């Protein structure tokens, strides 16, 4: 995996931030001015197929996001770290915790999807899957989930 992440701060406390679906690492931008960069170092990672990694190969799964998160931490030399996850990223941080509990110091979930996933019927899954190729469906999902 290309280890691409935006790193902010130089503090000893390490934090990896994972965005929600349809988001990317730059989506955290409005919060940057509020971060404590003296005591914390933050890594904002793009998932496969998102942001700077758009067009990268899959798999495009929560398990792969968790794997890539641990690979990023290894690449950065972060033996221990905390995780912040929004929505789908909240599901991924739970998977990271399950995969490497000895490395995770704290979790913050912002409206997290459960680690077990969202309970959709077949029609719901088909609708969400079609968002990969249909901009109108993506817009409908964003409108539905953001009010």
Question: PLM features: what roles do these ranges have?
Answer:
Residues 81, 85-87:
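Conserved alpha/beta-hydrolase "nucleophile elbow" surrounding the catalytic nucleophile
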Residues 64-81:
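Conserved acidic catalytic loop of the alpha/beta-hydrolase fold
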Residues 10-12, 77-80, 102:
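Active-site acidic short loop of glycosyltransferases
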Residues 94, 98, 104-134:
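Flexible "cap/lid" loop of the alpha/beta hydrolase fold
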Residues 90:
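Residues forming the Rossmann-fold NAD(P)(H) cofactor-binding site
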Residues 43-45, 86, 110:
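The conserved SAM/SAH-binding core of class I Rossmann-like methyltransferase domains
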Residues 6-55:
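Conserved HGGG/HGGXW glycine-rich cap/lid loop of the alpha/beta-hydrolase fold
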Residues 54-66:
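Catalytic nucleophile-loop/oxyanion-hole region of alpha/beta-hydrolase
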